Amino acid sequence: MKGGKSKTESKRADPKLAVNKKGAATKARKPAGKGKAAKDPNKPKRPPSAFFVFMEEFRKVFNKEHPENKAVSAVGKAAGAKWKTMSDAEKAPYVAKSEKRKVEYEKNMRAYNKKQAEGPTGGDEEESEKSVSEVNDEDDDEEGSGEEEDDD
């Protein structure tokens, strides 16, 4: 059987040509993870939804009524159940507070974005980008020229 291959041999893929699909998928994900920018600590936090505004108050009441219950999940489940039973009229104050915080957040974000846009163009950062040795070298050059004149 010089020229022909058996059916089982022809069905098998050449191991040298095989592509590791799992490895290729993980390799594709890695660069995306590296490119993720670090979070800016000065960036304003997103405003809470009406439900989370409700949760702030509900948590205080629930903890007073059930001091022995330390599970976060129990508080969340109880709050969710109560929120579902509330009418739109009962939810209205929380929605209003949420909208107020949203307007404040948008104002803060405009100020933050304006500050970010102005930041890189500022002249102060150019001086701070110089290393300490570069600044010291400039000072030494100025002092050195003054010392040479004293010797004359």
From Swiss-Prot:
Q: Return the Low complexity bias intervals.
A: 74-84
* TM region(s), chain numbering: none
Q: Kindly list the GO molecular function terms attached to this UniProt entry.
A: chromatin binding; DNA binding; structural constituent of chromatin
Matches recorded under InterPro entries = HMG_box_dom, HMG_box_dom_sf, HMGB_plant
Q: Acidic residues bias: where? A: 135-152
Gene3D superfamilies assigned to the protein according to its UniProt record, in alphabetical order: High mobility group box domain (1.10.30.10)
The molecule here is called: HMG1/2-like protein
List residues annotated as DNA-binding: 44-113
Its Gene Ontology biological processes? Answer: chromatin organization
Q: Name one Pfam family in it.
A: HMG_box
